[in-house]
Amino acid sequence: MIELKHVTFGYNKKQMVLQDINITIPDGENVGILGESGCGKSTLASLVLGLFKPVKGEIYLSDNAVLPIFQHPLTSFNPDWTIETSLKEALYYYRGLTDNTAQDQLLIQHLSTFELNAQLLTKLPSEVSGGELQRFNVMRSLLAQPRVLICDEITSNLDVIAEQNVINILKAQTITNLNHFIVISHDLSVLQRLVNRIIVLKDGMIVDDFTIEELFNVDRHSYTKELVQAFSY
């Protein structure tokens, strides 16, 4: 379970980015955080990951095995390491897997799942496309077997086929390994396919919180309706 109680945060004392955030996410629930750029979505993710401490309030995680997948994969990889080295480092660090043959077998399995060519393993991050690197980024996090996954705009560099592939993989992971994941996105179609609950942020505050089945209810907040209408165009 993840619980945020009256969480307030700002990068300086004069302006708070998030104000009085209250969220409870039970195990097995996948949640989307929706809102415009600058509303505090990524800051909220950073707080859950423990990268920042709230100015006020408390954050409780029942499981410490929480990992992120960030929007810009190039900054997530060591530029001097091959893709293979980065992936195997995750297997060693998070799972204690040192046997090279076992590592290779896991990589081969995941390459097939993510529809990636094994020849890319010898490349540096700068030598593969943005879409390929983002899929490797997702793969690396899943190889570490986290219980909770924080996904920040992870489909932004993917074409529609690769996007659906990643979505299918993440959904399958909730059945096997993940307790749940939190998806930060401005793309409503991604959230509709991935999560069963959406929390809407506006100006650092929660203005709406509903299940995916309630998305088009007439009692949705006016800002939620604006986002839905904008996306429909």
From Swiss-Prot:
One of its GO terms (cellular component) is plasma membrane. One of its GO terms (molecular function) is ATP hydrolysis activity. SMART domains: AAA. Coiled coil: none annotated. ATP binds at residues 35-42. Its EC number is 7.2.2.11. Its main location: membrane. CDD domains: ABC_NikE_OppD_transporters. It is a peripheral membrane protein. The complex is composed of two ATP-binding proteins (NikD and NikE), two transmembrane proteins (NikB and NikC) and a solute-binding protein (NikA). Part of the ABC transporter complex NikABCDE (Opp2) involved in nickel import. Probably responsible for energy coupling to the transport system. Belongs to the ABC transporter superfamily. This is Nickel import system ATP-binding protein NikE. It comes from Staphylococcus aureus (strain bovine RF122 / ET3-1).
